[in-house]
Curated annotation (Swiss-Prot):
Residues 464-473 have a biased composition (Polar residues). Its main location: secreted. Residues 159-254, 258-356 form the Link domain. Coiled coil: none annotated. Two isoforms were found that probably arise by proteolytic processing. The large isoform is predominant in early postnatal brain, the small isoform is found in adult brain. O-glycosylated; contains chondroitin sulfate. May modulate neuronal adhesion and neurite growth during development by binding to neural cell adhesion molecules (NG-CAM and N-CAM). Chondroitin sulfate proteoglycan; binds to hyaluronic acid. This is Neurocan core protein. Keywords: Calcium, Cell adhesion, Disulfide bond, EGF-like domain, Glycoprotein, Hyaluronic acid, Immunoglobulin domain, Lectin, Proteoglycan, Repeat, Secreted, Signal, Sushi. Residues 949-985, 987-1023 form the EGF-like domain. GO terms for biological process: cell adhesion; central nervous system development; modulation of chemical synaptic transmission; regulation of postsynapse organization; regulation of synapse structural plasticity; skeletal system development. Glycans are attached at residues 121, 339, 380, 410, 737, 944, 967, 1164. The gene is Ncan.
Length: 1257
């Protein structure tokens, strides 16, 4: 293609020359009237392909009459461009009297080939063409006062694009690369095409095949892992000619469109097959990748991903805007995976780009005008596998969004984030007559920095329907129109009363964000009936525009949210992650955004569970709060089930009757913020005594723990409390200010005992301490009675261990042990009945929840620390009560019931100690301390300033000269350098941190270290560079290096290095190897060779072979004695390979640093300043003549790169006597020439065309 285009351009120029000669012989009579006449071209725009040559014609005629010498025609070529709404002429070249001057930026690309022989032919030869060369060109000819000009339009066709196979990166052989370009309506690009695209700013860090079987890629801005052809400089990097079977990507070149590409955006997006069919119905076909790039090149701008013929999804961007293609124009690709590989699945739904041949090419502005502003981007996240569920009573059918696969868009500043989440599935057995359980929609926490574990977003539990019961779905559909990115609306179906929001993924520590939206009983769990095993979930994060949707119609989703629901089927107790009617409190930590979904459906009547195992104790949440940085207190962890808070005053507990929820009585969509708790009744075993569950809002989360809010809390939801901050310093707390109250109830509930100290205003507090002990109570089995008034058996011990090990044994299955937590706590009082006051404590409680009996009723088995069973009452309830003064919990409900209050039998009187807590969580190695109420006295003593009268520094416990410093009863040692430890008893090695710079050797001594510096370095740490390198050379560890990009054979390269007082580089350490390899990114010669003795490799600078870095199975002497020289292979991190010495490659020279000795002495002169022994390269010294002598010539000399000084030019002489100077001053015999003859030549006035020479070289 290149040779043909050059010949065509040459023939065009020849034809133009013949044309002008004929025109000059047959001039019109009107032409003779003017001295200058421009032969204007009447044809249309000139089209030429990228990287080719083009001739822009410019002819004029001259009247053959005599004219002054100054009337020589002046020719000027300019490019007309528009800037700020005004036309500007960009100079290209000027020519006059066979002198041509080319403007900067056009040198080497433009010429006037016919002008030297035919001064009336100013045809401009331009090339190799770039895409930016398209535009309007002006040829202007000026002769005297006559001025003629002509305009020529140039259109550069063709575009270079990178193509990656669908299956993976670097997956194409050379033959496959050619075929891929052919299927994309293009050809494989030539090196000149890629070079032209690079010169226009094309940057792509993917190696791809070119037509000459080389592999290259263009880099306009070097960055780690993506370098140009030279170190940290832009260029097209080449791997050279490669084996055709090697695998790379490919660069394609599309030349002409030959039709039109148009965008198809139906109301409902299409699968790949649907997109093909839709284009065929419109008399077109899916556009190819090359056709879309050509359409983009011609002005197509559409911020909507669409299917193409090869199964990829792309969209063209002309005007970059926020969340629409990144910061630069181009064709963006939507990849399936986050590493920019894979095409979307054929079943995914997008719009389409169709191509219709032999139609008018769309002009700029024909496409749909994109809307401006902060518009959304298309985000897709793959959700959990969707089990085949049938809609339950009161449920609605929810249609999944159109996107079916996770998608990541390439080339964007704000990438389409993707997080794949899978949820484990549990199948719960159900017997006839059991309750109909609703699926609870839980929002999980995802992080963009990684892929969460399969269970990180909850547990999928398959719903079951009682046998013989048929539940018909009652779908009530609505169609929501989501405003698109340039005016159109995406169509999405969903339930009327359900708006699903998402947890925002962030690269920062995960933040729990759950949406508190109204979900009435009619808005039940999604019923997904799909043939696929995986049903991804996605939303369109655009502005929500749903007409007629009530108050939710004008809501806008956050900018970049993703959601992936998890389904939970609770057995008898719902998860606290889905608490109705809660809003985050005003005093919650800013790092936690709390919101809860309403339960989608609740039974209208109490139902009796039957043989349903419950994973009640399934998760424990660990949160650590770093506090405010106070040094007085350690970081305290919170081991809790639900996050329950304490009240410092007495309040009331609401006694709410069961609330049957039905479609006629939906929950309110909003709850006042002061109503922190809303009780919800569920059906229990006894229809007459439904158990009551009250769920509390989550508490404040940790700001410093990466694990905060990353573990879901399930199955613990029968305590009721609200949190109130406790003001005042820690030392003023007493037991009356810390209160925990379980809710007394006749029904079986799952409870916790929680102790929280929340001290946000304390100047000495380092956070908050929470100690939660998980206990459980169950209703008696049928046929058994329980005396609720019976007295409990007192059990007490002090300073013992509380072990909470949730263990669930499923009927007929293996025991599951999801979490264990062990904690040492102070004694706790436990009442074995549900109505009496606390009177004693248990020493150690090992809680095991198992399925007991035929009916699978879970029982609680507390055991003592000695292993004996303390209490095992499957027919009773076990309620944990604190030993603090009683108080009640608060709720702003209308119906309230007073909880009896009283004083405990005894108060804690254990000595105040800090008891360590070991958290048995795999995700955390945090060791913290919990507090006992007895800490009050300890901190009061500290606050009062009491201390041991004995001075701890009296005997100076610090060793090795350390200084003892006291702080009350505590002391600390300030150690001298080289020592560490509590008493400065550890002699540390100062050289472990490598303090010596520039390759210096560190030697550890008794009280410090010393550095042995390499030559040319000095200072205590070898930080001073005492010797330098010549210009263009780089210094590293005492030597100077220089990379030469021009190619030579090995012997010629060594000879060139020796001319520069060096050798081909030698390598003696990994650090030096890394430094040398950073110069160029092509294979380069080094000084290693075995030319003298086979297999005996030596360096040319005669240094020893101390370090080797050969490629695998090298050296191999492949050419049987012809591989005697060594090259650094660039694409293998500079590993060595022996090759024939006649290869022409770049090379690196190495030489020592250079210094000059004392400057040479000059007669009758001395140096200015202090005389030194050594001088760096390029140093300059000045001489001054002694007193009584006059200076002649230059007084300075310079130290050259060869270590030698310039020859001094200064001459100091004594002045002659004045009378002798006067005697020889006048020479009467010498005849002076007339002044006229000494006059300089008259300077010619500057021509007007020379005024533009400031723009030219």
């Amino acid at each position: 293609m290149g040779a043909e285009s050059v010949w065509a351009s040459g023939l065009l120029v020849l034809w133009l020359l013949l044309l002008v000669s004929g025109d000059q012989d047959t001039q019109d009579t009107t032409t003779t009237e003017k001295g200058l006449h421009m032969l204007k071209s009447g044809s249309g725009p000139i089209q030429a392909a990228l990287a080719e040559l083009v001739a822009l014609p410019c002819f004029f005629t001259l009247q053959p009459r005599q004219s002054p010498l100054g009337d020589i025609p002046r020719i000027k070529w300019t490019k007309v461009q528009t800037a700020s709404g005004q036309r500007q002429d960009l100079p290209i070249l000027v020519a006059k009297d066979n002198v041509v001057r080319v403007a900067k930026g056009w040198q080497g690309r433009v010429s006037l080939p016919a002008y030297p022989r035919h001064r009336a032919n100013a045809t401009l030869l331009l090339g190799p063409l770039r895409a930016s060369d398209s535009g309007l060109y002006r040829c202007q000819v000026v002769k005297g006062i006559e001025d003629e000009q002509d305009l020529v339009t140039l259109e550069v066709t063709g575009v270079v694009f990178h193509y990656r196979a669908a299956r993976d990166r670097y997956a194409l052989t050379f033959a496959e690369a050619q075929e891929a370009c052919h299927l994309s309506s293009a050809t494989i690009a030539a090196p000149r095409h890629l070079q032209a695209a690079f010169e226009d700013g094309f940057d792509n860090c993917d190696a791809g095949w070119l037509s000459d079987r080389t592999v290259r890629y263009p880099i306009t801005q070097s960055r780690p892992g993506c370098y140009g052809d030279r170190s940290s400089l832009p260029g097209v990097r080449s791997y050279g000619r490669r084996d055709p079977q090697e695998l790379y990507d490919v660069y394609c070149f599309a030349r002409e469109l030959g039709g039109e590409v148009f965008y198809v955006g139906p109301a409902r997006r299409l699968t790949l097959a649907g997109a093909r069919a839709l284009c065929q119905r419109q008399g077109a076909a899916l556009a190819s990748v090359g056709q879309l790039h050509l359409a983009w090149h011609e002005g197509l701008d559409q911020c909507d991903p669409g299917w193409l013929a090869d199964g990829s999804v792309r969209y063209p961007i002309q005007t970059p805007r926020r969340r629409c293609g990144g910061s630069a124009p181009g064709v963006r690709t939507v990849y399936r995976f986050a590493n920019r590989t894979g095409f979307p699945a054929p079943g995914a739904r997008f719009d389409a780009y169709c191509f219709r041949a032999h139609h008018h090419t769309p002009q700029r502005g024909d496409s749909e005008i994109p809307s401006s502003g902060d518009e959304g981007e298309i985000v897709s996240a793959e959700g959990p596998p969707a089990p085949e569920l049938k809609p339950r009573l009161g449920e609605q059918e929810v249609i999944t969004p159109d996107f079916q696969e996770p998608l990541v868009s390439s080339g964007e500043d704000e990438p389409l984030d993707l997080t794949r989440t899978q949820a484990s599935q549990e199948t719960l057995a159900s017997t006839p007559g059991g309750p109909t359980l609703a699926s609870w929609l839980l929002t999980g926490v995802t992080s963009s920095t990684g892929v969460p574990s399969p269970s990180s977003l909850g547990v999928d539990m398959e719903e079951t329907t009682p046998s013989g019961t048929q539940v018909a779905p009652t779908p009530t559909m609505r169609r929501g129109r989501f405003k698109g990115l340039n005016g159109r609306h995406f169509q999405q179906q969903g339930p009327e009363d359900q708006l699903l929001e998402a947890a925002e993924a962030s690269a920062q520590p995960p933040t729990l964000e759950v949406t508190a939206d109204h979900m009435g009983p009619s808005a039940a769990t999604e019923a997904l009936e799909s043939d696929q095993s995986h049903s991804p979930w996605a939303i369109l994060t655009n502005e929500v525009d749903v007409p007629g949707a009530g108050s939710l119609g004008s809501r806008s989703l956050p900018e970049s949210r993703k959601w992936s629901p998890s389904l939970i089927s609770p057995s008898t107790v719902p998860s606290t992650d889905s608490t109705p009617g809660l809003k985050p409190g005003a005093d919650e930590a800013p790092g936690v955004k709390s919101a809860i979904h309403h339960p989608p459906w609740l039974p209208s009547e109490p139902a009796v569970p039957s043989s349903i195992p419950s994973e009640a104790l399934s998760a424990v949440s660990l949160q650590a709060s770093p506090g405010d940085g106070s040094p007085d207190f350690p970081i305290v962890a919170m081991l809790r089930a639900p996050k329950l808070w304490l009240l410092p005053h007495s309040t009331l507990v609401p006694n709410v009757s069961p609330i049957p929820l039905s479609p006629a009585s939906p929950l309110p969509s909003s709850v006042p913020e002061e109503q922190a708790v809303r009780p919800v009744s569920f059906g229990a075993e006894d229809p007459e005594t439904p158990f009551q569950t009250t769920m509390a809002a989550p508490g404040e989360a940790s700001h410093g723990s990466p694990e905060a809010d990353s573990i879901e809390i399930e199955g613990i939801s029968s305590m009721q409390a609200t949190k109130h901050p406790i003001s005042g310093p820690w030392a003023s707390l007493d037991s009356s200010n810390v209160t925990v109250n379980p809710v007394p109830s006749d029904a079986g509930i799952l409870g916790t005992e929680s102790g929280v100290l929340d001290l946000p205003g304390s100047p000495t507090s380092d956070g908050q301490a929470t100690v939660d002990m998980v206990l459980a109570t169950w209703l008696p089995l049928p046929g058994h009675g329980l005396d609720t008034g019976s007295q409990s058996t007192p059990m007490e011990a002090h300073g013992v261990t509380m072990s909470v090990e949730p263990t669930v044994a499923l009927e007929g299955g293996a025991t599951k042990d999801p979490m264990e937590a062990t904690m040492d706590v102070v004694p706790s009082t436990v009442d074995a009945t549900s109505g009496s006051e606390p009177k004693s404590s248990i020493s150690s409680t090992h809680v095991v929840v198992t399925a007991a009996g035929d009916q699978g009723t879970p029982t609680l088995t507390p055991t003592s620390s000695e292993g004996q069973v303390v209490a095992q009452e499957s027919l009773g309830t076990l309620t944990s009560l604190p030993s603090h003064p009683w108080s009640s919990l608060a709720s702003s409900m209308d119906e309230v019931a007073s909880v009896s209050s009283g004083e405990p039998t005894r108060l804690w009187d254990i000595p105040s100690t800090l008891i360590p807590v070991s958290l048995g969580l795999d995700e955390s190695d945090l060791k913290v301390v919990a507090e006992s109420p007895g800490l009050e006295g300890f901190w009061e003593e500290v606050a009062s300033g009491q201390e041991d009268p004995t001075d701890p520094c009296e005997n100076n416990p610090c060793l090795h000269g350390g200084t003892c410093r006291t702080n009350g009863t505590m002391y600390g040692c300030s150690c001298d350098q080289g020592y560490a430890g509590e008493n400065c008893e550890i002699d540390i090695d100062d050289c472990l941190c490598s303090p010596c710079e520039n390759g210096g050797t560190c030697i550890d001594e008794v009280n410090g270290f010393i550095c042995l510096c390499l030559p040319s370095y000095g200072g205590n740490l070898c930080e001073k560079d005492t010797e330098g390198c010549d210009r263009g050379w780089h210094k590293f560890q005492g030597h100077c290096y220089r990379y030469f990009a021009h190619r030579r054979a090995w012997e010629d390269a060594e000879r060139d290095c020796r001319r520069r007082a060096g050798h081909l580089t030698s390598v003696h350490s990994p650090e030096e190897h890394k430094f040398i390899n950073s110069f160029g990114h092509e294979n380069s010669w080094i000084g290693l060779n075995d030319r003298t003795v086979e297999r005996d490799f030596q360096w040319t600078d005669n240094t020893g072979l101390q370090y080797e870095n050969w490629r695998e199975k090298q050296p191999d002497n492949f050419f049987a004695g012809g591989e005697d020289c060594v090259v650094m292979v660039a694409h293998e991190n500079g590993r060595w390979n022996d090759v024939p010495c006649n290869y022409n490659l770049p090379y690196v020279c190495k030489k020592g640093t250079v210094l000059c000795g004392p400057p040479p002495a000059v007669e009758n002169a001395s140096l200015v300043g202090v005389r030194k022994v050594k001088y760096n390269v390029h140093a300059t010294v000045r001489y001054q003549c002694d007193e009584g002598f006059s200076q002649h010539h230059v007084a300075t000399i310079r130290c050259r790169s060869n270590g030698k000084w310039d020859r001094p030019q200064i001459v100091c002489t004594k002045p002659r006597r004045s009378h002798r100077m006067r005697r020889h001053h006048h020479h009467p015999h010498r005849h002076h020439k007339p002044r006229k003859e000494h006059r300089k030549h008259k300077r010619h006035p500057a021509e007007d065309w020379e005024k533009d020479e400031g723009d030219f070289c």
